[in-house]
Amino acid sequence: MSEGDKLGSTGVVGIEKAPSRIGENPGRRVLRALAESFPKTVSGGTQLRPGVIRAKVDRSDLYSACRTLKEDLGFEHLTMISAVDYEDRFEIVYHIASYQSRLLIELISTTPKDDPVVDSVSSVWGGANWQERESYDLMGIVFKSHPKLERILLPKDVLYHPLRKDFRG
């Protein structure tokens, strides 16, 4: 491997250098790179439509998968974080864009309702800071290692999270 072909900091070859299979589009190449890098924790790789892909990642590898997406696969912009409240779990949904590859990935991680904790990705994308605080404030999801995890919209002494389905206001 030449000096210019070295692996990225997380050990994955960048999308432009990742070996492609005949006829494989960039979205499928990203999904394959994630699945190969995190074989036990990344699943459900799907191309939703041209330029939009989706994958699920176990919360234990969320931070590492996000670093891989940014540093090795060129996903430079976290466009949004959202949370979905299901009966027994939360899904945290990340929309992450690669403008160079013209791709958007919807990365989904799940956490049980009785342990709503995932790693913060604010050190990967600075824009995650306020979005994680909003999810904490309104849904009660805790983002480990967040630099300032506190309420952003509601008063600091409020004891509830108003967008949770179990909230009775």
Model segments located where?
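Terminal low-complexity/charged segments
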Residues: M1-G169
